[in-house]
């Protein structure tokens, strides 16, 4: 009898060989992808709304990508420049919208505050009427008279007095910055500077990923909206996170959140930090704490109009700790204030610390590129240690 076991045709044998080779290639690629995945540091940016998370992401793009271009992967410098200019042009509208929102919000608040604020020059009332009349106009085209009225109102001492009470209503942080630049922004050939783009406020909704490389190490940074209704999306990002960067608006001690106009913003951040620190899915993930908006905190403390103890009574008994390291020339009142806020967060992390994750605080100013460069460089060793521990290599 003939042997039937070797009845495969030449074509079948070639096909099986090709399949084996294809499987090997797939397996090799999967192993390579796995190595790249395991070598990537995934950073999750969390924090309450308007704490500065998106500004941190913008700084990473300035420092480690090609600035403000679309993808950040162009090898051709001319293409990168072209994309960067294109994105800046699209941001002009966002900046103009910030400017419009700022002057609208201030003049609308004047009559609603208790006690109300009067115009220093009553003849400017027609300008107020104009600003309020265009408040909800869709696709506003920013005619010259808008800039004229906005500038005249911004120079009115009554409007300035209302601005000084902005903790009593909801005003974007960049209001003064852009109102001071009306003459620049109104120009037809206006191109935003990097600082303009850093200051520009656009509500983050959803999850945004930014990829960048530092000294051949891959980083993926996830920016998630901080408003209450956005937080349910956070859990989608918890898988394989190397570290959490929790961003706090330190200057918000005298402000309330937009969502309910009642809850103190800094208290909201403390509550949120506590819930993240104690979350059972995150008990092994350390937190890098960015105590942000130090420039605005210093302004408020030195102005002396809103005292921290009026909102956090325990500050009256607080003394600056021995480990405090003031910035050169820093006023002792500012040092005391910023370390008080730091210690409020550290009380939470030490109260329920189990040695499985740690909190690393840093004082930041997200609109200051050099500050963020220095802080992120300081954090890289911490992130590397977390990454090694994550894959049980340490």
Curated annotation (Swiss-Prot):
It is found in: Cell membrane. A lipid is attached at residue 3 (S-palmitoyl cysteine). Residues 196-204 are annotated as: G2 motif. There is a cross-link at residue 300 (Glycyl lysine isopeptide (Lys-Gly) (interchain with G-Cter in ubiquitin)). It comes from the Eukaryota. Residues 1-23, 68-91 are annotated as: Disordered. Keywords: Cell membrane, GTP-binding, Hydrolase, Isopeptide bond, Lipoprotein, Magnesium, Membrane, Metal-binding, Nucleotide-binding, Palmitate, Phosphoprotein, Transducer, Ubl conjugation. Residues 288-295 are annotated as: G4 motif. Residues 364-369 are annotated as: G5 motif. Residues 39-394 form the G-alpha domain. Its EC number is 3.6.5.-. The keyword Signal does not apply. The modification Phosphoserine is found at residue 352. Its main location: membrane. Residues 219-228 are annotated as: G3 motif. GO terms for biological process: adenylate cyclase-activating adrenergic receptor signaling pathway; adenylate cyclase-activating dopamine receptor signaling pathway; adenylate cyclase-activating G protein-coupled receptor signaling pathway; sensory perception of chemical stimulus. A lipid is attached at residue 2 (N-palmitoyl glycine). GO terms for cellular component: cytoplasm; heterotrimeric G-protein complex. GTP binds at residues 47-55, 197-204, 223-227, 292-295, 366. Mg(2+) binds at residues 54, 204. GO terms for molecular function: adenylate cyclase activator activity; beta-2 adrenergic receptor binding; corticotropin-releasing hormone receptor 1 binding; D1 dopamine receptor binding; G-protein beta/gamma-subunit complex binding; GTP binding; GTPase activity; insulin-like growth factor receptor binding. It is a lipid-anchor. Residues 8-23 have a biased composition (Basic and acidic residues). It catalyses: GTP + H2O = GDP + phosphate + H(+). Heterotrimeric G proteins are composed of 3 units; alpha, beta and gamma. The alpha chain contains the guanine nucleotide binding site. Component of the TAS2R14-GNAS2 complex, consisting of TAS2R14, GNAS2, GNB1 and GNG2; within the complex interacts with TAS2R14; this complex plays a role in the perception of bitterness. Interacts with CRY1; the interaction may block GPCR-mediated regulation of cAMP concentrations. Interacts with ADCY6 and stimulates its adenylyl cyclase activity. Interacts with ADCY2 and ADCY5. Stimulates the ADCY5 adenylyl cyclase activity. This is Guanine nucleotide-binding protein G(s) subunit alpha isoforms short. It comes from Bos taurus. The gene is GNAS.
